[in-house]
């Protein structure tokens, strides 16, 4: 026993002998870091606790570390009700005494808040040499060059201005990036409400480009987008969840609460740089990469990946995931096609071509496509439902399918139910309801795979709606109070008031104006979707494509191609 005890003490003694810094010195170096010190100034010293542990394995330290490192954490707690938890964490190089990592506030719990290069969409689309050309082409094709100070040009700039907040996000500056999202959201909301209430298109000069030119450019850009997706894009957890759900459904398993997890399951893969092993043997005997929270979306978010899964399959690992890339590309192209059809039907050749071009050239649609999320699936059903807006049945089906992908589009259900108004006969409303119910029943039929539908429905609620409602997130203004930091207000009450106003607004626009044109339907749909995003606790730049089709339709609808002179 004495020999065993001595053997266990040898590695610890060896590690201690190789340390250049003491625990106290490593902690002091971390606390003196400018970024850390600025954040800690927001907290009283009372209740603050610092700790540091030595890590001898350089592979678990920051890249480039030659020896060991110190993992330092700072927590703060005032009482049982006011507990900020870990408020700062990072690493100190033991040999160089350099702070190699310093994460504060939202960066502690959210790695996506740390500004890792290319974390969303890959490195190319996030680089200025790709992003700025998309912005330039978008303006070149749609701007009113005859009137540089026109309202239409301001609208286009507002759409592109989300780029500023995204730039700060990509550099890990959450407390700057998030507030910068709201001015363009509020502006576009106001513009959509104004157009939707007045029912008049935006006055604009004759377009610079012919429909054929815009359409040819759009086809070229779409081809370029597809190549860029295949060559340099990544798949985040959202897209990965889609193919997992498709595999579960194809195997006769309800996806909810059956996603790959780690827990204490047998490992079947290597550990990452943080020592975490994601690949585990799951309940089905397969070695799969964990994504335990991926079952938080509606059933359509998984059913939409079935064709891609059947064609390209899934290895079980979080690898290149070709089925996800295929699905993203298909829905990206479908969005462009649907917009073209809607524009052609309601506004003519120029509007149809312009909408396809707008979708193709807008950098945020490519950003979502190259992140390979399910955010292209959300608008596609509404786009085609809008194209077939004269059919109550089609409107009901489209709202249900979109809302059962991610739940936000359900906010437009009253508006689409009463379109075009006024409601005089029950038949159109019944047709809408029938389409909605049929689509809902078909979408939720996967709950029957469980064998206990009632329990499956409860599981669905627990994993989706309850999770979404109770989640915490720094990616909006509404939940920053969780940090209990000086100078950061608690806006939960404001959020609740805005939520009530949104619901009230959704009911009001269902009946006011009494009759609505396709332009008003598009504008008010865009307004409601923007309103929903304004009050979200967890917001992302990936959500911009939800409202973009309807906003850009409303903003470009007034442009008319000049008729050719008769000979």
Summary of predicted features, one role per range:
Residues 40-95:
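Exposed beta-strand-loop-beta-strand "reactive/processing" segments of non-cytosolic proteins
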Residues 121-125, 145-153, 168-180:
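Membrane-helix interface and helix-disruption motif detector
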Residues 396-402, 408-419, 543-546:
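Transmembrane-embedded, aromatic-rich helix segments that form part
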Residues 1-17, 214-224:
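Hydrophobic secretory-pathway targeting helix
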Residues 16-63, 122-130:
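Short, non-transmembrane alpha-helical segments in secretory-pathway proteins
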Residues 157-211, 224-386, 393, 420-541, ...:
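Primarily membrane-embedded glycan-assembly and transfer machineries that use lipid-linked glycans
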Residues 133-161:
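Juxtamembrane interface at the cytosolic side of transmembrane helices
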Residues 94, 98-128, 313-316:
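Short, aromatic-rich amphipathic segments at membrane interfaces
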């Amino acid at each position: 026993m004495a020999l065993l005890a001595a053997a266990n003490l040898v590695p610890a003694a060896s590690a201690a002998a190789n340390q250049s810094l003491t625990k106290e010195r490593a902690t002091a170096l971390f606390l003196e870091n400018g970024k850390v010190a600025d954040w800690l100034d927001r907290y009283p010293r009372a209740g603050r606790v610092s700790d540091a542990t030595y890590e001898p394995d350089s592979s678990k330290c920051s890249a480039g570390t030659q020896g060991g490192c110190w993992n330092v954490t700072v927590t703060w707690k005032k009482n049982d009700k006011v507990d900020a938890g870990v408020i700062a964490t990072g690493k100190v190089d033991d040999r160089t005494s350099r702070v190699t990592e310093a994460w504060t506030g939202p960066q502690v719990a959210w790695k996506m808040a740390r500004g890792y290069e290319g974390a969303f969409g890959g490195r190319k689309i996030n680089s200025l040499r790709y992003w700025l050309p998309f912005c330039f082409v978008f303006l070149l094709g749609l701007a009113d060059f005859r009137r540089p100070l026109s309202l239409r040009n301001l609208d286009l700039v507002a759409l592109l201005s989300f780029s500023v907040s995204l730039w700060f996000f990509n550099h890990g500056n959450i407390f700057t990036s998030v507030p910068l999202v709201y001015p363009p959201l509020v502006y576009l909301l106001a513009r959509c409400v104004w157009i939707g209430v007045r029912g008049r298109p935006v006055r604009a000069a004759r377009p610079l480009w012919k429909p054929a030119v815009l359409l040819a450019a759009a086809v070229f850009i779409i081809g370029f987008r597809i190549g860029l997706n295949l060559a340099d894009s990544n798949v985040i957890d959202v897209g990965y969840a889609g193919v997992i759900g498709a595999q579960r459904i194809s195997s006769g398993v309800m996806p909810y609460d059956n996603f790959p997890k780690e827990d204490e399951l047998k490992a079947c893969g290597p550990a990452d740089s943080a020592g975490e092993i994601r690949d585990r043997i799951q309940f089905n005997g397969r070695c799969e990469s964990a994504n335990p929270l991926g079952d938080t979306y509606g059933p359509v978010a998984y059913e939409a990946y079935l064709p891609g899964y059947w064609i390209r399959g899934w290895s079980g690992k979080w690898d290149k995931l070709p089925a996800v890339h295929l699905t993203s590309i298909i829905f990206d192209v479908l969005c462009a096609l649907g917009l073209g059809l809607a524009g052609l039907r309601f506004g003519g050749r120029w509007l149809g071509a312009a909408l396809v071009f707008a979708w193709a050239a807008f950098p945020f649609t490519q950003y979502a496509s190259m992140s390979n999320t399910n955010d292209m699936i959300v608008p596609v059903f509404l786009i085609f439902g809008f194209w077939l807006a004269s059919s109550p049945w089609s409107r009901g089906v489209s709202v249900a399918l979109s809302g059962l992908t991610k739940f936000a589009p359900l906010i437009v259900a009253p508006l689409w139910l009463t379109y075009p108004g006024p409601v005089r006969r029950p038949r159109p409303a019944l047709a809408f309801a029938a389409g909605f119910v049929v689509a809902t029943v078909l979408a939720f039929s996967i709950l029957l795979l469980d064998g206990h539908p009632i329990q499956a429905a409860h599981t669905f609620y627990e994993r989706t709606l309850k999770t979404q409602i109770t989640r915490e997130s720094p990616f909006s203004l509404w939940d920053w109070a969780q940090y209990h930091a000086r100078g950061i207000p608690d806006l939960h009450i404001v959020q609740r008031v805005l939520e009530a106003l949104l619901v009230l607004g959704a009911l009001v626009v269902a009946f006011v104006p009494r009759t609505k044109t396709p332009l008003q339907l598009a504008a008010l749909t865009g307004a409601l979707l923007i309103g929903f995003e304004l009050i979200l606790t967890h917001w992302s730049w990936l959500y911009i494509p939800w409202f973009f089709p309807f906003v850009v339709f409303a903003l470009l609808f007034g442009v008319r191609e000049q008729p050719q002179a008769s000979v």
